[in-house]
Amino acid sequence: MAIIITMLLMGILLGFVGAGGAGFIIAILTLVFHIPIHVALATSLTAMAFTTLSGVVSHYREGNVALIIGGIVGGFGAIGSYIGSKFGSLIPAHLLHWFTAGMLFLSAIFMFIKLIMFQNKEQSSLYKHKEFSMNYLLKCICLGLVTGMMAGSFGIGSAPFIQLGLMVLLGLTIQQSVGTTMLVILPIAIGGGLGYSSEGYLDYILLLQVLIGTMLGAYIGAKFTNYAPRMLLRFSMIMTPVLAGCMLLME
């Protein structure tokens, strides 16, 4: 029950600021509840498959999802995530804390770049105006494999990396990149979850507790997002992975 209540409170906070919670879930489970980090990674990654599903549907209805690109990047992302989960399961726990924390700090830097450099930049979608060439296809495949392996190895969603890749490499608009990132994360989470599950690291009771708390909390928190100053939301989105990384280093 303590895990559900904690995840509920965390979900409210994350839903309010609109930040990704994978790193926070890992940090809370390992630091507060002393869950082994491999189990925490498996739980966090699998939980993302459920929490992003509603986001994908919502963004698709708004027309912010590039289905073909998302399908290709996500498909190869699932392969990369499965491979990454096999690699992550071999990393000793004491080293995995450092690696995951490092990835969270790096994701904060990428989030800063996205929010500062791209947020107010008008950009036409190159995807609509150019042929789907072999070079473009290779970019999709590489983006999927790299971000998928990162997510599978370290249990984080890699959303800032995926979003920047979609904008810089594939020419999507900011709106398209947000919605398409949700679609990409879905198969990545499934692939990584299957990989960790096959290694015996997925605790289904723990997963259910995390899902109940975070999904309910995020729904409540999102209701209050419009009342927060925009600068506070941007600051919170950058500092969330930083705080999660610091918590992991305390373990």
Features from the language model and the residues they span:
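Juxtamembrane transmembrane-helix boundary motif
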Residues: M1-I12, L31, I37, R61-S153, ...
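Juxtamembrane transmembrane-helix termini in multi-pass membrane transport proteins
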Residues: G11-V73
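Short hydrophobic/aromatic, small-residue-rich stretches within specific transmembrane helices
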Residues: S44-M48, T181-I185, L206-L207, L211
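Membrane-interface helix-cap regions at the ends of transmembrane helices
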Residues: F50-E62, P187-D203, L249
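Hydrophobic alpha-helical transmembrane segments of multi-pass integral membrane proteins
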Residues: Q176-G191
